[in-house]
Regions:
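Conserved small/polar residues in nucleotide/adenosyl-binding loops
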Residues: 160-167
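Structural signature of PLP-dependent enzymes
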Residues: 79-102, 130-138
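Conserved PLP phosphate-binding loop immediately N-terminal to the Schiff-base lysine helix
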Residues: 1-22, 28, 34
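Structural motif of enzymes handling amino- and sulfur-group chemistry
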Residues: 66-86
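Short beta-alpha connecting loops at secondary-structure transitions
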Residues: 27-30, 56-65, 85, 130-133
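Conserved PLP-binding catalytic core of the aspartate aminotransferase-like
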Residues: 98, 109-143
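Active-site PLP attachment segment
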Residues: 24-53, 68-75
Length: 167
């Protein structure tokens, strides 16, 4: 069974998440608060034969404290509407992400990017594995991270389409 955890990538790489972006169809997918516009909402889905195992059709019971929270569901619906209302949303998101990536590279930093998801590494080459990430200069990254925070720039954020080139 192939399960895609799209808590980070869902609706950020494409309207079909990493699954659509990479052209791979999983048996199940999980999505996090992006589907609720940042509100406490999550969901999962899968192939018919798997989903039929979930109650009330099947014997697998599932429930949650915030299941079906009306405010979160409304925020999720509005998130989808906003994405659908912007022509070429994902192309624009990718263009703006590339602009930020290039600005980071111009400063001599190494950045890995997939769509709008990106991170800076303090090393000489593109990071392709966990071991390579661990070998990076974490002390330099710490100084960079603290400097960015003190400058009002939150590097753990995810890009959206609103920023202009001036931003």
């Amino acid at each position: 069974m192939l399960i895609f955890d799209e808590v980070i990538t869902g609706l950020r790489l494409s309207d079909g998440g990493a699954s659509k972006y990479f052209g791979v169809t999983p048996d199940m997918t999980t999505l996090g608060k992006i589907v609720g516009g940042g509100m406490p909402l999550a969901c999962y889905g899968g192939k018919l034969e798997i989903m039929q195992c979930v109650a009330p059709l099947g014997s697998v019971y599932q429930a949650g404290t915030l299941s079906g929270n009306p405010c979160a569901v409304a925020a999720g619906i509005e998130t989808i509407r906003q994405i659908e209302s912007i022509p070429n949303f994902y192309e624009e998101l990718d263009r703006k992400s590339a602009m930020i990536e290039n600005a980071i590279r111009e400063k001599g930093l190494n950045v890995n990017r997939c769509g709008s998801l990106m991170t800076v590494f303090f090393n000489d080459e593109r990071v392709k594995s966990y071991d390579e990430a661990r070998a990076c200069n974490t002390e330099s990254y710490g100084r960079y991270y603290r400097h960015m925070l003190q400058s009002g720039i939150y590097t753990a954020c995810l890009l959206y389409t609103s920023p202009s080139p001036r931003d």
